[in-house]
Amino acid sequence: MKKIAISPGDLAGVGPDICIKAFKDLSKTSTPVFFGDPNLFEHRAKSLNIDIDIREYEGEDDLIQDKFYVKSYEFNSKITPGYPTPIYADYLIEILKEATKLNLSREFSALVTGPINKELINKGGIEFKGHTEFLAKESNTEKVVMMLANEHLKVALATTHEPLRNVPSLITEDHISDCINIINNDLQDKWKINNPNIKVLGLNPHAGDG
């Protein structure tokens, strides 16, 4: 099965807990590798009363399916769940950069990112608008579109992480056209939808009035 890289997100948030709780289901369809401190995952698993057998991931392909593989990045400061702090902002970005790099090199087939506190990272002295913009920069991709998707519905956003007052000026004919082209191409190429049916919603609730 394909290997997927998973960054847990905010160390003091629910991300590590979600990783641990979702591990068994994830392992049915893929081979997950979690990026972070093994001690953090072990501590959180104990607090959840969930048994996991942690193994350190070292780049191998023949992973044992029921083992909890961690690409190890030690973090020596104390983490208290529910109390986020900017002291680990650099650490979060380091993990994201490494996970992104290994995906771009095809060592992994996908990257899953846990919930992250953008304000916390910015308070740590790092400019961070969101995962979408971060991944675009790391992959040298000029134009990207964020999509929320499940098997029944896919919703793409024309703008992301922008103050509402700035949005009207960003909704231009060229920008919407670029978004539609990206969505159309990826629905056909990555989702194997031969003739995508794309609906465009207006910013103004009366945009459809005659």
Stretches with model-predicted labels:
Residues M1-H131, D174-G210:
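Contiguous, glycine/small-aliphatic-enriched amphipathic segments in soluble metabolic enzymes
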Residues E60-D62, E138, V167, I171:
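Short alpha-helical interface patches
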Residues L148-C179:
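Ligand-binding beta-strand-loop-alpha-helix segment within the catalytic cores
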Residues E56, V70-S72, M146-A149, L157:
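Structural signal for conserved beta-strand scaffold positions within catalytic alpha/beta enzyme cores
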Residues K123-V145:
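Glycine/threonine-rich beta-strand-loop-alpha-helix active-site module
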